[in-house]
Amino acid sequence: GSMRLTSPLSPAIHTGATRILVISTRDGVPDRLPATAPEPPSIGEMAAYALDIMFNDNLEADTERMLRINNTVSLLSPEAREKTPLKVIETLMLNPSQDIRPIAKRHRGSLPRAMRILMRSLGVMGGDGRMESYLMFEPDYVSDLIALGYADTLARRDEVAGFLAG
């Protein structure tokens, strides 16, 4: 939902969700600034950043907005809560325990030749793996992502089970 929507959680909220499980592809660790002034980004790198913003920034901003509303609603008296259409929506966000871009970089050689040529011509192939992480659906890469998600979810198994049990 976060590709078309600036508020990707909105459809779930407006259809009456009382709990939302949010699964993100961003590890939550901010990117480090380079020690030296970077080269100007290529067209492909700018496109990769645009994809990152479209998918992740909107999701994170919407989740943060919902948590602020939850906090505000929880401060209201029971009488005041009855007068507002706002309600507390339980939320659990699952983030990968590691940045998925290095995983994409490891698998970039498995991209079809035409895709590698296109990405090289756009100046992306030597980059940080951001574009590849969005475009790659090669079986080994997807398997690594599934394994990471599975391990991360097992590490939070009690929290996830409690959330799903309601």
Q: Which residue stretches match the model-derived regions?
A:
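Patatin-like phospholipase
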Residues: 1-166
